[in-house]
Protein backbone atom coordinates (compact mmCIF):
# COMPACT_ATOMS: atom_id res chain seq x y z
CA UNK A 1 0.00 0.00 0.00
CA UNK A 2 1.38 3.37 -0.97
CA UNK A 3 0.20 6.62 0.47
CA UNK A 4 -1.15 9.82 -1.07
CA UNK A 5 1.23 12.72 -1.60
CA UNK A 6 0.83 16.22 -0.20
CA UNK A 7 -1.24 18.37 -2.56
CA UNK A 8 -2.73 15.38 -4.36
CA UNK A 9 -6.51 15.27 -4.78
CA UNK A 10 -8.06 11.90 -3.94
CA UNK A 11 -11.46 10.32 -3.52
CA UNK A 12 -12.54 8.79 -0.22
CA UNK A 13 -14.56 5.57 -0.35
CA UNK A 14 -16.44 4.21 2.63
CA UNK A 15 -17.55 0.56 2.53
CA UNK A 16 -19.70 -1.66 4.71
CA UNK A 17 -18.42 -4.86 6.33
CA UNK A 18 -19.95 -6.95 3.52
CA UNK A 19 -17.89 -5.06 0.90
CA UNK A 20 -20.70 -2.91 -0.49
CA UNK A 21 -20.02 0.77 -1.10
CA UNK A 22 -21.47 3.05 1.57
CA UNK A 23 -20.44 6.58 0.54
CA UNK A 24 -17.91 8.35 -1.73
CA UNK A 25 -16.40 11.83 -1.43
CA UNK A 26 -15.35 13.08 -4.86
CA UNK A 27 -12.35 15.23 -3.96
CA UNK A 28 -10.19 15.67 -0.89
CA UNK A 29 -6.84 17.49 -0.96
CA UNK A 30 -4.07 15.68 0.90
CA UNK A 31 -2.30 17.94 3.40
CA UNK A 32 -0.16 15.21 4.96
CA UNK A 33 0.31 11.69 3.68
CA UNK A 34 2.47 9.03 5.27
CA UNK A 35 2.26 5.27 5.63
CA UNK A 36 0.54 5.70 9.01
CA UNK A 37 -1.29 9.05 8.87
CA UNK A 38 -3.36 10.94 6.32
CA UNK A 39 -4.76 14.43 6.87
CA UNK A 40 -6.92 15.84 4.11
CA UNK A 41 -9.30 18.72 3.51
CA UNK A 42 -12.32 19.38 1.37
CA UNK A 43 -14.97 22.04 0.92
CA UNK A 44 -18.19 21.77 -1.03
CA UNK A 45 -17.25 18.38 -2.41
CA UNK A 46 -19.79 16.04 -3.98
CA UNK A 47 -20.76 13.05 -1.83
CA UNK A 48 -22.45 10.04 -3.45
CA UNK A 49 -24.53 7.72 -1.28
CA UNK A 50 -24.86 3.97 -1.88
CA UNK A 51 -28.28 4.48 -3.51
CA UNK A 52 -26.83 6.97 -6.01
CA UNK A 53 -28.17 10.13 -4.36
CA UNK A 54 -25.67 12.99 -4.21
CA UNK A 55 -25.22 16.01 -2.00
CA UNK A 56 -22.56 18.66 -1.51
CA UNK A 57 -20.76 19.28 1.78
CA UNK A 58 -21.64 22.67 3.28
CA UNK A 59 -18.42 23.74 4.95
CA UNK A 60 -14.67 23.21 4.93
CA UNK A 61 -13.62 20.01 6.66
CA UNK A 62 -10.33 18.53 7.85
CA UNK A 63 -10.19 14.71 7.72
CA UNK A 64 -7.92 12.64 9.97
CA UNK A 65 -7.08 8.97 9.28
CA UNK A 66 -4.55 6.83 11.17
CA UNK A 67 -3.42 3.27 10.49
CA UNK A 68 -3.42 2.31 14.19
CA UNK A 69 -6.94 3.45 15.09
CA UNK A 70 -10.34 2.10 14.17
CA UNK A 71 -11.85 5.52 13.64
CA UNK A 72 -11.51 8.58 11.47
CA UNK A 73 -12.33 12.15 12.43
CA UNK A 74 -13.81 14.96 10.36
CA UNK A 75 -13.49 18.47 11.79
CA UNK A 76 -16.05 20.81 10.20
CA UNK A 77 -15.44 24.56 10.38
CA UNK A 78 -18.71 26.36 11.06
CA UNK A 79 -19.52 29.89 12.24
CA UNK A 80 -20.22 28.64 15.78
CA UNK A 81 -16.91 26.77 15.96
CA UNK A 82 -15.51 23.38 15.03
CA UNK A 83 -17.85 20.40 15.04
CA UNK A 84 -16.38 16.92 14.76
CA UNK A 85 -17.91 13.82 13.27
CA UNK A 86 -16.07 10.64 14.20
CA UNK A 87 -16.69 7.42 12.30
CA UNK A 88 -15.87 4.13 13.99
CA UNK A 89 -14.22 2.34 11.11
CA UNK A 90 -11.39 0.13 10.03
CA UNK A 91 -7.98 1.76 9.68
CA UNK A 92 -7.56 3.31 6.22
CA UNK A 93 -6.12 1.70 3.12
CA UNK A 94 -4.94 3.60 0.06
CA UNK A 95 -4.60 2.55 -3.56
CA UNK A 96 -4.54 4.35 -6.89
CA UNK A 97 -8.34 4.58 -6.82
CA UNK A 98 -9.01 6.14 -3.40
CA UNK A 99 -8.44 6.29 0.33
CA UNK A 100 -10.71 3.53 1.69
CA UNK A 101 -12.13 2.29 4.97
CA UNK A 102 -14.93 0.11 6.33
CA UNK A 103 -17.64 2.02 8.18
CA UNK A 104 -18.85 0.25 11.34
CA UNK A 105 -21.97 2.35 11.91
CA UNK A 106 -21.12 3.88 15.29
CA UNK A 107 -20.39 7.59 15.23
CA UNK A 108 -19.51 10.23 17.78
CA UNK A 109 -20.62 13.82 17.20
CA UNK A 110 -18.53 16.37 19.08
CA UNK A 111 -19.74 19.94 19.59
CA UNK A 112 -17.59 23.10 19.81
CA UNK A 113 -17.75 22.97 23.64
CA UNK A 114 -16.29 19.41 23.42
CA UNK A 115 -19.44 17.71 24.66
CA UNK A 116 -20.28 14.67 22.55
CA UNK A 117 -22.96 12.15 21.68
CA UNK A 118 -22.54 8.50 20.65
CA UNK A 119 -24.79 7.90 17.64
CA UNK A 120 -26.27 4.97 15.69
CA UNK A 121 -25.98 2.24 18.32
CA UNK A 122 -29.20 0.71 16.96
CA UNK A 123 -27.79 0.67 13.41
CA UNK A 124 -24.63 -0.98 14.72
CA UNK A 125 -26.62 -3.73 16.48
CA UNK A 126 -28.73 -4.35 13.36
CA UNK A 127 -25.78 -4.47 10.94
CA UNK A 128 -23.74 -6.53 13.40
CA UNK A 129 -26.35 -9.29 13.09
CA UNK A 130 -27.13 -8.90 9.38
CA UNK A 131 -23.46 -8.78 8.29
CA UNK A 132 -22.28 -11.08 11.09
CA UNK A 133 -19.53 -8.93 12.53
CA UNK A 134 -17.13 -11.27 14.33
CA UNK A 135 -16.88 -10.80 18.13
CA UNK A 136 -13.34 -9.41 17.75
CA UNK A 137 -14.78 -6.43 15.79
CA UNK A 138 -17.09 -5.61 18.71
CA UNK A 139 -14.13 -5.75 21.11
CA UNK A 140 -11.96 -3.56 18.87
CA UNK A 141 -14.72 -0.99 18.34
CA UNK A 142 -15.52 -0.71 22.06
CA UNK A 143 -11.83 -0.17 22.79
CA UNK A 144 -11.66 2.51 20.09
CA UNK A 145 -14.79 4.30 21.35
CA UNK A 146 -13.00 4.51 24.72
CA UNK A 147 -9.80 5.76 23.02
CA UNK A 148 -11.72 8.36 21.05
CA UNK A 149 -13.62 9.69 24.07
CA UNK A 150 -10.34 9.88 25.98
CA UNK A 151 -8.83 11.95 23.15
CA UNK A 152 -11.88 14.24 23.22
CA UNK A 153 -11.54 14.79 26.98
CA UNK A 154 -7.79 15.35 26.68
CA UNK A 155 -8.12 17.49 23.52
CA UNK A 156 -5.57 15.23 21.88
CA UNK A 157 -4.83 14.50 18.21
CA UNK A 158 -7.41 16.07 15.89
CA UNK A 159 -9.23 17.51 18.94
CA UNK A 160 -6.21 19.55 20.05
CA UNK A 161 -6.75 23.31 20.17
CA UNK A 162 -5.88 24.86 16.79
CA UNK A 163 -5.43 21.46 15.04
CA UNK A 164 -8.28 22.07 12.58
CA UNK A 165 -7.46 25.77 12.11
CA UNK A 166 -3.79 25.02 11.43
CA UNK A 167 -4.59 22.40 8.77
CA UNK A 168 -7.29 24.62 7.26
CA UNK A 169 -4.68 27.37 6.80
CA UNK A 170 -2.50 24.83 4.98
CA UNK A 171 -5.48 23.84 2.82
CA UNK A 172 -6.01 27.46 1.78
CA UNK A 173 -2.53 27.45 0.21
CA UNK A 174 -3.71 24.75 -2.21
CA UNK A 175 -7.00 26.45 -3.03
CA UNK A 176 -5.46 29.73 -4.19
UniProtKB/Swiss-Prot annotation:
A GO molecular function held by the record: magnesium ion binding
The keyword Repeat belongs to this UniProt entry's keyword annotation: no
Catalytic reactions on record: a ribonucleoside 5'-triphosphate + H2O = a ribonucleoside 5'-diphosphate + phosphate + H(+); a ribonucleoside 5'-diphosphate + H2O = a ribonucleoside 5'-phosphate + phosphate + H(+)
Cofactor: Mg(2+)
Binding sites annotated in the UniProt record for Mg(2+) 2: 105, 107, 120, 123
Record: residues binding Mg(2+) 1: 87, 103, 107
InterPro entries documented for this protein: DUF402, FomD-like_sf, Ntdp-like, SA1684
Key words of the record: Hydrolase, Magnesium, Metal-binding
Annotated active site: 23 (proton donor)
EC number: 3.6.1.15, 3.6.1.6
Role according to the record: Has nucleoside phosphatase activity towards nucleoside triphosphates and nucleoside diphosphates.
Family to which this protein belongs: Belongs to the Ntdp family.
UniProt name for this protein: Nucleoside triphosphate/diphosphate phosphatase
Native organism taxonomy: Bacteria, Bacillati, Bacillota, Bacilli, Bacillales
